[in-house]
Structure formats: structure tokens, C-alpha cells
């Protein structure tokens, strides 16, 4: 499924295609990023649970052009500095994601 879609999206000359490793709908089996890369000619961004080392490896191998860090950024406002320092990451509290108020937005510890 992702291969077919990625190939068809080439015609639209998108700025990038953002794919997630997780398959919530059970439609794609196996490695989504490799299939997308084989069929999509533009910039490919991956996401979903990457560690810094996995992101580096995927980019170095040409599998992805960039990796997005969603949940990791929510829990680590200083994520780039933590990655650079190889520091431990804060555990995210999913009960505070996208909720009103400051809890979960301004109270995570920084280095």
C-alpha cells in the first residue's frame, strides 16, 4: 500500500513525505520507510519512536532524509542538547499531551 501511494505522490512534487514506522491500521507489513524510499523520489522524513542512534543510522544509510521526534520533544524541551550530550531522556507523561494548562508543557526537567 505505501509503495503505491508513495509512487503516486511523486506527481505532486511535495516538499516532503512524512511516514511513520507504526502501522495503526494493519495495512502495511514490514519496513514502511524502505518501501517508501524505493518508490518516492523526494525528501522522506521518518517518525515514531526513533532513538538518536537509529535516526543517525537511517539517515547515514540513505533510508531517510530526516527524522522527526514528536513525543521525545514533548518530554524533553532541550532534546537537541540531550542528544548531543548523549544524556538520558525524560519519560513522557502521555496523560498531559495536548491538554489545557501548563502541566506537561513547562514542567519537564532540563539538563
Regions found by a protein language model. Give the residues of each.
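Flavin-dependent oxidoreductase catalytic cores
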Residues: 1-111
Amino acid at each position: 500500500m505505501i509503495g503505491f501511494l508513495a509512487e503516486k505522490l511523486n506527481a505532486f512534487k511535495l516538499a516532503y513525505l512524512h511516514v511513520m514506522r507504526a502501522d495503526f491500521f494493519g495495512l502495511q507489513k514490514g519496513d514502511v520507510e524502505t518501501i517508501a524510499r524505493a518508490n518516492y523520489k523526494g525528501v522522506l522524513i521518518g517518525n515514531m519512536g526513533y532513538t538518536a542512534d537509529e535516526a543517525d543510522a537511517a539517515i547515514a544509510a540513505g533510508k531517510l532524509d530526516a527524522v522527526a521526534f514528536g513525543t521525545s520533544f514533548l518530554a524533553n524541551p532541550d532534546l537537541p542538547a540531550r542528544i548531543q550530550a548523549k544524556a538520558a531522556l525524560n519519560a513522557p507523561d502521555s496523560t498531559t499531551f495536548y491538554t489545557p494548562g501548563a502541566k506537561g508543557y513547562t514542567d519537564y526537567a532540563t539538563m
